[in-house]
Amino acid sequence: MKNKVVVGVTQRVDKIDIYGEWRDALDQRLVDWVVEAGFIMVPIPNVLVDVSLSNDSQPNLDIWLNTINIDALLLSGGNDIGSVPQRDVTERYLLRWAAKNSK
C-alpha cells in the first residue's frame, strides 16, 4: 500500500471576544477538499513561532516540522498580511523551510 502524502496546512487566526481567546482555524471545506484529494491533512499551529526571533530561527516550529515530517505545504486563506504578525512569521518561515527542504 502506497503511503499518502502528508500536507501541512496553515491556519488563520480568529479572535473570539466572547471567550477572550485567539484561535487558529481552518474552513472545514478546505479540510474536506484536501482529504477528498487523497492527502493526509495536518494543521500547522501559529503559536509555535516567536515573533521576536528572526525569520531564520524558529526552533519550536523546526521541532514540529521534523516530528510531523510533512511532504507538502498549503498556505490557506485568511487574515490580511500584517494584521496577525504571528501568522505572517509562520508563513514566511514555512516558505523558506519548504524551499530548503523540497523533495
PLM feature segments, named:
Residues 1-103:
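N-terminal beta1-alpha1 cap of cysteine-dependent amidohydrolase-like domains
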